Amino acid sequence: MVIQKNWQELIKPNKLQVSAGDDPKRVATVVAEPLERGFGTTLGNSLRRVLLSSLQGAAVTSVQIDGVLHEFSSIPGVREDVTDIVLNIKTIAIRSQTDQPKRMTLRKTGPGLVTAGDIGAVGDIQILNPDLVICTLDDGAEIRMEFTVATGKGYVPADRNRPEDAPIGLIPVDALFSPVTKVSYRVETTREGQDLDKDKLTMTVETNGAVSPEDALAYAARIIQDQLQVFVNFEEPRKEEAAPLAPQLPFNPALLKKVDELELSVRSANCLKNDNIVYIGDLIQKSEGEMLRTPNFGRKSLNEIKEVLAGMGLHLGMDVPGWPPENIEDLAKRFEEHY
């Protein structure tokens, strides 16, 4: 028996459709089809669990409030008690560019609302919901807080966020590090050719904005892939490689490389795929204006692609004589060793 048939003959999704919600940075629906019967539930459930439990994120882990010794206190001139303030602090959405704990401060004088946007800026930290109300100050009231922000995964209860040498007045906070706030999936029947019993997996992912839904799904898939690798206890037999003479081409053989090998971000790669840009030779003939007219393709993706192409000595808007060549897939395989 040829062992490769165990996985090579299974149907794999040939379509991955991404539909952004009202806020593309926070909500998206991804459809994968066709899948072998039963794989929709297997993959959907696994991805959902990993999305909710295993992605790294940032959260407030403790807070100190001037004049407050514990969370059951009240603050003169502040309408909310400390317990309510701590509950509001738990919902601050944060993006952190560092693994190290950081301190952030807030100071404000009333009257008025105190919001997450009043927290002093720190270079590596970004508040994603600045309009979140933390508390309300009466006229003449003043409040000063100091927050500790850390990175982690999953849910960590407050008692585990209290340092052994915690000073008096430090209030630990329940930390929900996961940037993914909600995941749902459904499995429907679809067809592949004459087969009517294949699965169609639809996943809706919501995040707090620290990571896009598309990237969150990609990270979750990578985690599952990495965890399963230990179970693969064999090496696949190598195919015998033929060594035909490579024909002379009127262009750089590197243009035969596929764009999905460029290690682009998930968003950039999906935009190229949706625009039927398969090879680097297809890509470099596009102008910047043409790329920016591609749906969901923005300036950030454009700069990323320009930087990658520059590293190869290429740029957008190039004229490539003889492109596309005949039998391009065959040529790409024959020139793999050359790029």
Swiss-Prot record:
Leading EC class: transferase
Gene Ontology MF terms in the entry: DNA binding; DNA-directed RNA polymerase activity; protein dimerization activity
Entry-linked Gene3D superfamilies: 5' to 3' exonuclease, C-terminal subdomain, DNA-directed RNA polymerase, insert domain, RNA polymerase, RBP11-like subunit
CDD domains with a match to the protein in the record: RNAP_alpha_NTD (cd06928)
E.C. number(s) listed in UniProt: 2.7.7.6
One protein family per Pfam: RNA_pol_L
Entry's Gene Ontology cellular component terms: cytoplasm; DNA-directed RNA polymerase complex
Catalytic activity: RNA(n) + a ribonucleoside 5'-triphosphate = RNA(n+1) + diphosphate
Keyword Transcription listed: yes
Residues covered by region (Alpha N-terminal domain (alpha-NTD)): 1-235
Alphabetically ordered keywords of this record: DNA-directed RNA polymerase, Nucleotidyltransferase, Transcription, Transferase
UniProt region (Alpha C-terminal domain (alpha-CTD)), positions on chain: 251-339
BP GO terms, sorted: DNA-templated transcription
UniProt note: domains: The N-terminal domain is essential for RNAP assembly and basal transcription, whereas the C-terminal domain is involved in interaction with transcriptional regulators and with upstream promoter elements.
Family the entry assigns: Belongs to the RNA polymerase alpha chain family.
Function: DNA-dependent RNA polymerase catalyzes the transcription of DNA into RNA using the four ribonucleoside triphosphates as substrates.
Quaternary assembly: Homodimer. The RNAP catalytic core consists of 2 alpha, 1 beta, 1 beta' and 1 omega subunit. When a sigma factor is associated with the core the holoenzyme is formed, which can initiate transcription.
Name used for this protein in its record: DNA-directed RNA polymerase subunit alpha
Species whose genome carries this gene: Methylorubrum populi (strain ATCC BAA-705 / NCIMB 13946 / BJ001)
The gene coding this protein: rpoA
